[in-house]
C-alpha cells in the first residue's frame, strides 16, 4: 500500500472540526501520544514571564449543564456552524480560539462561564 500524503491532506481539508477532533483523539489513543504542545519550563525569570504573554488560547475544559447555551456561546465567539460548535462543546477539552489578546480571551472566558462552562487560558 502506497502512502499518499497529498490525498491525506486533501481529505483533512474537507473534514469538519468535530471530525478532526475525533481523529486526533483516536491517534492519541492508538499511538499513546499527546497532541498538546510541549510546555516550556520558565527559569528564574521571576513573575514577569506570565505578564509578558501577548496571545492566549481559550480552552473549554468542561461544558457544564447548559450545553445548548454553551453551543450558542461557542458559535457567537467563533462564527462556526452549529455542527462544528456542537462538536467542540461535546468533545471537551477543546480549543475554542487560538492566539487572541488577553482582553479578548477574558471576554470569551466570561461568556462561556456565564453559561456554566469551565475555561482555561493557555
From Swiss-Prot:
For biological process, the GO terms are: translation
Please give the InterPro entries that the UniProt record associates with this protein: Ribosomal_bL12, Ribosomal_bL12_C, Ribosomal_bL12_C/ClpS-like, Ribosomal_bL12_oligo, Ribosomal_bL12_oligo_N_sf
Which Pfam families does this chain map to? Ribosomal_L12 (PF00542), Ribosomal_L12_N (PF16320)
Q: Which GO terms describe its cellular component?
A: cytosolic large ribosomal subunit
Q: A Gene Ontology MF term for this entry?
A: structural constituent of ribosome
- Keyword vocabulary terms for this entry: Ribonucleoprotein, Ribosomal protein
What the protein does?
Answer: Forms part of the ribosomal stalk which helps the ribosome interact with GTP-bound translation factors. Is thus essential for accurate translation.
Assembly behavior: Homodimer. Part of the ribosomal stalk of the 50S ribosomal subunit. Forms a multimeric L10(L12)X complex, where L10 forms an elongated spine to which 2 to 4 L12 dimers bind in a sequential fashion. Binds GTP-bound translation factors.
Family according to the record: Belongs to the bacterial ribosomal protein bL12 family.
Protein name in UniProt: Large ribosomal subunit protein bL12
Origin species: Lactiplantibacillus plantarum (strain ATCC BAA-793 / NCIMB 8826 / WCFS1) (Lactobacillus plantarum)
Amino acid at each position: 500500500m502506497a502512502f499518499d500524503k497529498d490525498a491525506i491532506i486533501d481529505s483533512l481539508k474537507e473534514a469538519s472540526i468535530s471530525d478532526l477532533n475525533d481523529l486526533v483523539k483516536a491517534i492519541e489513543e492508538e499511538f499513546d501520544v499527546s497532541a498538546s504542545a510541549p510546555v516550556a519550563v520558565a527559569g528564574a525569570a521571576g513573575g514577569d514571564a506570565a505578564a509578558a504573554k501577548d496571545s492566549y488560547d481559550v480552552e473549554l475544559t468542561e461544558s457544564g449543564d447548559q450545553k445548548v447555551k454553551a453551543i450558542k456561546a461557542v458559535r457567537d465567539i467563533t462564527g462556526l456552524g452549529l455542527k462544528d460548535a456542537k462538536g467542540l462543546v461535546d468533545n471537551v477539552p477543546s480549543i475554542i480560539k487560538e492566539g487572541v489578546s488577553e482582553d479578548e480571551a477574558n471576554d470569551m472566558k466570561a461568556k462561556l462561564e456565564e453559561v456554566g462552562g469551565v475555561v482555561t487560558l493557555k
